[in-house]
């Protein structure tokens, strides 16, 4: 598989992965938006814009066109990366070689994607009132209902408290008021600003690289902006001064303990080491946390860790009996101390490396996963093949993992508890 990065214009890059392995191909167009601008309007754009466009104003007409294109798919969504999120227009389609009637599937799907992206359904300089109000309601309803999922609520609450005042805290906000203030015209203004200024990364996974390059230049011409903003991460490491503790009482039986940690953002040189540490410490079924805190000591119902490599933030989340809070907390930190000291076996290290390497190699199973992989590589400033990454993973040493562990510092503790005699009202 051949990877190539090509600058189409200022702030607009094309990344291609040439392969003939699959029957389908993938085309994605990312518009990068800094979280520092609190992009509430932008959050509504994917669902509003995929309801219809000027040429196909209803979902039924869109579906009919996609059916004609051999069940191609087009969508829009909002992946996040560090202190940025991406308004991504995505498509997947069958290769033209498999069309029995000489249909230009690739060209037709790309044209439909451009229709959704560049010619949205607009009336009097604004998006549809109906679609905008519907998506505002859906978003506000989802935010109000977030508390019903106690596991994700506790994790997000800890991260919001830990990252208060930082751009990334936007991702964990449950405030509905900014969404209620959005109008169809203000939403359209946000769309126009993105199209005019946002950095663009286009990814293509397939056989016809010339096709992708033609599309990229066509898009550049349609947008008519040779000098877009340039992506630059503003994430900085904020060393914890002291551990902060927060508690909330809810109508639950099973308490939740979430510990937020800080580390420096990962770099292309150490991301593999840190992920091996994550696998070893708390991110796999054979991790230190699962094996000891849950299985051996029975201090929790579940216990796992998760890291955002771009911000350096990491959390350990557990479901526990309230009376086990201190025991679980101390054991979680004790297991971290053991890893810092290199107190783990060669077998544990090998399992962690192989588990992570297998995850990376599974990227090669589909065009969409490859597209996501090369996009992340581009954002990090280093695109390697999955095989090259797997080789780097397998070379990680015990001392490197211990050193990575020593960079992880506890910052914020969030404890959610209730009256364990009450009926639990949670999903």
Task: Specify the residue positions occupied by each region the protein language model found.
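Flexible helix-coil linker/hinge segments at domain or subdomain boundaries
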Residues: 119-123, 228-231, 344-347
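Short, low-order "capping/linker" segments at domain edges
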Residues: 140-147, 242-256, 357-368
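Compact, aliphatic and Gly/Pro-tolerant "microcore" segments centered on a short helix or tight beta-hairpin
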Residues: 129-193
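His/Glu-rich zincin catalytic helix
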Residues: 1-69, 175, 181, 188-292, ...
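Short, flexible, solvent-exposed loop/turn segments with mixed acidic/basic and small polar residues
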Residues: 78-81, 187-196, 304-308, 402-406
């Amino acid at each position: 598989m051949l990877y190539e990065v090509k600058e189409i214009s200022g702030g607009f890059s094309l990344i291609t992965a040439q392969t003939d392995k699959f029957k389908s191909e993938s085309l994605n167009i990312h518009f990068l938006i800094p979280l520092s601008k609190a992009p509430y309007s932008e959050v509504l754009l994917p669902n509003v814009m995929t309801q219809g466009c000027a040429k196909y104003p209803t979902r039924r007409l869109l579906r009919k066109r996609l059916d004609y294109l051999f069940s191609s798919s087009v969508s829009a969504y909002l992946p996040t990366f560090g202190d940025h999120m991406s308004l991504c227009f995505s498509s997947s389609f069958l290769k033209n070689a498999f069309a029995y009637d000489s249909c230009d599937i690739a060209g037709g799907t790309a044209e439909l994607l451009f229709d959704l992206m560049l010619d949205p359904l607009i009336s009097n300089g604004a998006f549809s009132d109906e679609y905008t109000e519907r998506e505002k309601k859906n978003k506000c309803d989802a935010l109000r209902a977030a508390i019903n999922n106690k596991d994700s609520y506790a994790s997000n609450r800890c991260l919001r408290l830990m990252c208060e005042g930082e751009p990334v805290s936007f991702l964990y906000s449950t405030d509905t008021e900014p969404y209620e203030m959005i109008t169809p015209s203000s939403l359209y203004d946000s769309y126009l600003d993105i199209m005019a200024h946002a950095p663009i990364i286009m990814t293509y996974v397939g056989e016809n690289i010339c096709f992708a390059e033609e599309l990229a230049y066509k898009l550049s011409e349609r947008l008519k902006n040779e000098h877009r903003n340039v992506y630059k991460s503003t994430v900085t490491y904020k060393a914890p001064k002291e551990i902060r503790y927060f508690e909330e009482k809810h109508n639950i039986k099973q308490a939740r303990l979430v510990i937020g940690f800080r580390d420096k953002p990962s770099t292309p040189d150490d991301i593999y080491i840190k992920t091996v540490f994550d696998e070893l410490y708390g991110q796999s079924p054979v991790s230190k946390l699962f094996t000891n805190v849950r299985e051996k000591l029975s201090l929790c119902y579940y216990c796992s860790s998760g890291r955002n490599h771009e911000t350096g933030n990491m959390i350990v989340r557990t479901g526990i009996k309230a009376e086990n809070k201190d025991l679980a907390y101390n054991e979680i930190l004790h297991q971290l101390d053991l890893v810092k000291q290199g107190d783990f076996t060669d077998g544990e290290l090998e399992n962690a490396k192989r588990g992570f390497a297998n995850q990376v190699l599974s990227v090669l199973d589909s065009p969409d996963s490859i597209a996501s992989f090369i996009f992340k590589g581009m954002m990090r400033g280093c695109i390697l093949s999955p095989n090259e990454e797997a080789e780097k993973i397998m070379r990680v040493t015990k001392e490197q993992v211990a050193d990575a562990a020593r960079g992880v510092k506890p910052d914020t503790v969030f404890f959610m508890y209730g009256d364990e005699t009450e009926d639990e009202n949670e999903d």
